[in-house]
């Protein structure tokens, strides 16, 4: 495999690469191999550790002080990764220590490297057995239960955020949108929300204030369905279209089931023709009865009536893969200690403290 070639090596020992036209600066013991992921929030490269040959992923979070809200989001992601340790959550090795507190603009995370993700597996159209589905989904719900028991909700679960190795080991990644597990106001999700196809009714409710950890259960339910059929189950093109697709699938909700929606969302649904619920047994004829029974308890219109992640793991569908040690609660709730940040100077100080505390020098 052709590796990326460094452009220069600084006296400090840092290697400089050009990755997708941007400067990528890593410690001398790492050789970058290739880009494995990129987006608005950062770029991820695979790398090899000199000497040991260990393969890792290095994520560059760029221009962390460009926007205060975005910087606080990045800080939250970093704090969650340093605080929560579980086999089904991506493991952070350490942060690379910048040369100067006063001048650093980017943050580099060294993490476990995975071979692929569920999005690539689904798009490859490779044949998945029911055992594959059981094993993937029990791991996803183990990781999710651990997050929820730490009072954190992910809020952006989608197939590309579920990483997979050749041995089918799975880990949840990308905690950039994660928040404390509490009822959120609609304004909290205005800028950052679950990718549309995986949004539950309460996020599409146009004014609903009932955002809880149940949003993650809905998202994993849709991923489960996607694994069954090899395509997105609800590929809506906008908010209204997404809500219509949900109603077409689950049937027209009762007045009680719409109690969490805004008046506008309720009025829209009531203006539509009444729809009966579709049969999951007919929609997924290849699936077992236990699989469709579980799915029917995940894709529930009212968030309070969905199973919790803990209840999901107790479902008979997963009886073969139950493991009490992997299903334990987090020892402590996640605590966000940075509510005081109101300036970029305060953000710089707190980011530096976290990076220093978890840099390789302090491992």
Curated annotation (Swiss-Prot):
<dbReference type="GO" id="GO:0004674">
    <property type="term" value="F:protein serine/threonine kinase activity"/>
</dbReference>
<keyword id="KW-0067">ATP-binding</keyword>
<comment type="function">
    <text>Essential for the two main proliferating life stages, the promastigotes and amastigotes, of the parasite.</text>
</comment>
<dbReference type="InterPro" id="IPR050117">
    <property type="entry name" value="MAP_kinase"/>
</dbReference>
<dbReference type="InterPro" id="IPR011009">
    <property type="entry name" value="Kinase-like_dom_sf"/>
</dbReference>
<keyword id="KW-0597">Phosphoprotein</keyword>
<feature type="active site" description="Proton acceptor">
    <location>
        <position position="156"/>
    </location>
</feature>
<dbReference type="GO" id="GO:0046872">
    <property type="term" value="F:metal ion binding"/>
</dbReference>
<dbReference type="GO" id="GO:0004707">
    <property type="term" value="F:MAP kinase activity"/>
</dbReference>
<protein>
    <recommendedName>
        <fullName>Mitogen-activated protein kinase 4</fullName>
        <ecNumber>2.7.11.24</ecNumber>
    </recommendedName>
</protein>
<dbReference type="InterPro" id="IPR003527">
    <property type="entry name" value="MAP_kinase_CS"/>
</dbReference>
<dbReference type="InterPro" id="IPR000719">
    <property type="entry name" value="Prot_kinase_dom"/>
</dbReference>
<keyword id="KW-0479">Metal-binding</keyword>
<comment type="similarity">
    <text>Belongs to the protein kinase superfamily. CMGC Ser/Thr protein kinase family. MAP kinase subfamily.</text>
</comment>
<dbReference type="Pfam" id="PF00069">
    <property type="entry name" value="Pkinase"/>
</dbReference>
<keyword id="KW-0808">Transferase</keyword>
<feature type="short sequence motif" description="TQY">
    <location>
        <begin position="190"/>
        <end position="192"/>
    </location>
</feature>
<dbReference type="GO" id="GO:0005524">
    <property type="term" value="F:ATP binding"/>
</dbReference>
<feature type="modified residue" description="Phosphothreonine; by MKK5">
    <location>
        <position position="190"/>
    </location>
</feature>
<keyword id="KW-0723">Serine/threonine-protein kinase</keyword>
<feature type="modified residue" description="Phosphotyrosine; by MKK5">
    <location>
        <position position="192"/>
    </location>
</feature>
<feature type="modified residue" description="Phosphoserine">
    <location>
        <position position="187"/>
    </location>
</feature>
<feature type="domain" description="Protein kinase">
    <location>
        <begin position="30"/>
        <end position="318"/>
    </location>
</feature>
<keyword id="KW-0460">Magnesium</keyword>
<feature type="binding site">
    <location>
        <position position="59"/>
    </location>
    <ligand>
        <name>ATP</name>
    </ligand>
</feature>
<feature type="binding site">
    <location>
        <begin position="36"/>
        <end position="44"/>
    </location>
    <ligand>
        <name>ATP</name>
    </ligand>
</feature>
<feature type="modified residue" description="Phosphoserine">
    <location>
        <position position="186"/>
    </location>
</feature>
<keyword id="KW-0547">Nucleotide-binding</keyword>
<dbReference type="InterPro" id="IPR008271">
    <property type="entry name" value="Ser/Thr_kinase_AS"/>
</dbReference>
<dbReference type="GO" id="GO:0106310">
    <property type="term" value="F:protein serine kinase activity"/>
</dbReference>
<keyword id="KW-0418">Kinase</keyword>
């Amino acid at each position: 495999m052709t590796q990326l070639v460094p452009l220069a090596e600084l006296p400090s020992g840092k290697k400089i690469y050009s990755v997708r036209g941007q400067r990528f600066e890593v410690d001398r013991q790492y050789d970058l191999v290739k880009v494995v992921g990129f987006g608005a929030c950062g770029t991820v490269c695979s790398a090899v550790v000199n000497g040991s040959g260990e393969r890792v992923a290095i994520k560059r979070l760029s221009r962390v002080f460009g926007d205060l809200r975005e910087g606080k989001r990045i800080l939250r992601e970093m704090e969650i990764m340093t605080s929560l340790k579980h086999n089904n959550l991506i493991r952070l090795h350490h942060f690379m220590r910048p040369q100067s507190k006063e001048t650093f603009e980017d943050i580099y995370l060294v993490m476990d490297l995975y071979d692929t993700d569920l999005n690539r597996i689904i798009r490859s159209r490779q044949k998945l057995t029911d055992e594959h589905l059981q094993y993937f989904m029990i791991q996803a719900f183990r990781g999710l239960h651990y997050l929820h028991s730490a009072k954190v909700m992910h809020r952006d679960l989608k197939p590309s955020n579920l990483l997979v190795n050749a041995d089918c080991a799975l880990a949840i990644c990308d905690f950039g949108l994660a928040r404390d597990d509490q009822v959120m106001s609609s304004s909290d999700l205005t800028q950052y929300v679950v990718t549309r196809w995986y949004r539950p009714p309460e996020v599409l409710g146009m004014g609903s204030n009932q955002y809880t950890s149940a949003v993650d259960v809905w998202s994993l339910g849709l991923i489960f369905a996607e694994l069954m059929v090899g395509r997105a189950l609800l590929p809506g093109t906008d908010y209204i279209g997404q809500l219509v697709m949900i109603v077409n699938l689950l049937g027209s909700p009762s007045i009680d089931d719409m109690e969490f929606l805004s008046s506008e969302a309720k009025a829209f649904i009531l203006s539509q023709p009444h729809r009966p619920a579709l049969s999951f047994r007919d929609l997924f004829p290849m699936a077992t009865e236990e699989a469709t029974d579980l799915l029917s308890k995940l894709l529930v219109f009212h968030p309070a009536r969905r199973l919790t992640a803990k209840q999901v793991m107790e479902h008979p569908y997963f009886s073969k893969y139950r493991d009490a040690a992997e299903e334990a609660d987090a020892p402590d709730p996640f605590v966000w200690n940075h509510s005081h940040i109101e300036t970029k100077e305060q953000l710089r100080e707190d980011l530096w403290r976290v990076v220093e505390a978890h840099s390789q020098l302090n491992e």
